[in-house]
Amino acid sequence: MILGLALIPSKSFQEAVDSYRKRYDKQYSRIKPHVTIKAPFEIKDGDLDSVIEQVRARINGIPAVEVHATKASSFKPTNNVIYFKVAKTDDLEELFNRFNGEDFYGEAEHVFVPHFTIAQGLSSQEFEDIFGQVALAGVDHKEIIDELTLLRFDDDEDKWKVIETFKLA
């Protein structure tokens, strides 16, 4: 079973992000807009209850987090991915760190760059065309997210499904 942890924003911000993703993100139908807290990790089916309990314990003391999407950015030249950058806060970093150590299904492969992906799977030409448009449009959105979402990848439907949400203090 493949799981992941994410912060999922309000419906209104999901709609704003999805207005780009529908056009520019080939993964659009697989998952809602989100900030990844724990990248996909694999567990045995029988370990799900244990993972749920570990998540509950690890979020203890973490307050609801402010998410501030500040501008369009990209992972170029490493990757032709365009995203809305989220300002990194101590609370966001703490949440990420609690789930990305050897004691919870391994360390993160990448440095924590909180963001909402809006375009991926682009050719270099597509990237150049789209990035300019998105950067000009800009973004400045703040909201409080008070739940951490545990997701499971459903192979049959080829998409991520919510298993459980956990209230942040």
Curated annotation (Swiss-Prot):
Q: Where is this motif: HXTX 1?
A: 34-37
What are the boundaries of the signal sequence? none
Q: What is its EC number?
A: 3.1.-.-
Motif HXTX 2 covers 115-118
The record's active-site residues are: H34, H115
* Bilayer-spanning residue ranges: none
Keyword Hydrolase annotated: yes
Which superkingdom? Answer: Bacteria
Q: Which UniProt keywords apply?
A: Hydrolase
Note the InterPro entries from the entry: 2H_phosphoesterase_YjcG-like (IPR050580), Cyclic_Pdiesterase (IPR009097), YjcG (IPR022932)
Q: Which PANTHER family match?
A: PHOSPHOESTERASE SAOUHSC_00951-RELATED, PHOSPHOESTERASE YJCG-RELATED
Stated family: Belongs to the 2H phosphoesterase superfamily. YjcG family.
Q: What is this protein called?
A: Putative phosphoesterase SAOUHSC_00951
Q: Which organism does this sequence originate in?
A: Staphylococcus aureus (strain NCTC 8325 / PS 47)
